[in-house]
């Protein structure tokens, strides 16, 4: 399903709907959001503008954790999802986005990557 992307408001200040000058162009369409969750790794490859490929992470159970005290990065297993401060509905549904907090074997980790855009889960250990 295609989603409209940007563009002006559909209503005038009086409440009347703007007359449509033309149909939507392909480049004006968006895509469905990738609701990344904790689970067995599953990715989706999407062809984007210019023939490039964007990898969307649907599910993953491991995160690359950076420890600022030691200055090292380690791959750790996610024990459970804790919170997502960006959206309370995402927090309720357990959706991983940038800024989400998960519990790993090493401790609490804040996600720093954008899994729906990058296709990888990176995070920083929270003390």
From Swiss-Prot:
Keywords: Ribonucleoprotein, Ribosomal protein. GO terms for cellular component: ribonucleoprotein complex; ribosome. GO terms for molecular function: structural constituent of ribosome. One of its GO terms (biological process) is translation. It comes from the Archaea. Gene3D superfamilies: 2.40.10.310. Part of the 30S ribosomal subunit. PANTHER family: 40S RIBOSOMAL PROTEIN S8. Belongs to the eukaryotic ribosomal protein eS8 family. This is Small ribosomal subunit protein eS8. It comes from Nanoarchaeum equitans (strain Kin4-M). The lineage of its organism: Archaea, Nanobdellota, Candidatus Nanoarchaeia, Nanoarchaeales, Nanoarchaeaceae.
């Amino acid at each position: 399903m295609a989603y409209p992307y940007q563009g002006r408001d559909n209503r005038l200040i009086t409440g009347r709907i703007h007359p449509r000058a033309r149909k939507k162009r392909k480049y004006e369409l968006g895509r469905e959001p990738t609701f990344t969750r904790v689970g067995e790794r599953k990715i989706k490859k999407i062809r984007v503008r210019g023939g490039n490929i964007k990898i969307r992470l649907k599910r993953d159970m491991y995160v690359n954790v950076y420890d600022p005290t030691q200055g090292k990065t380690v791959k750790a297993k996610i024990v459970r999802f804790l919170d997502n401060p960006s959206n309370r509905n995402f927090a309720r549904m357990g959706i991983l986005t940038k800024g989400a907090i998960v519990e790993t074997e090493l401790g609490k980790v804040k996600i720093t990557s954008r899994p729906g855009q990058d296709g990888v889960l990176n995070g920083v250990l929270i003390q």
